Amino acid sequence: MARKVRVAAVQLNPDLDTPTGTVDRVITAIADAAAQGAELVVFPETVVPYYPYFSFVQPPMMSGGEHMRLYENAVVVPGPVTDAVSAAARRHGIVVMLGV
């Protein structure tokens, strides 16, 4: 018989000021999902640092600064962001899919 897995799909608002703020929100969401019995926690694409929402509302020539900020805040794998999320997953005994 197939084993059932409880999955949590997380939708959260990133901290647009700092990737660290978003990572804190991700770690809190992991703990909350695990407390509710989730075995797999899934986050949206590019949740860290954040989704380039401005691509839909600004012409490309006006988005250079935001693109540079995304580049500067890009997640390095492995690195501090993946280390923190991995530690939270280990601590709660769950699997995490994080879009970076």
Residue ranges: model-predicted function:
Residues M1-V100:
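Hydrophobic structural segments
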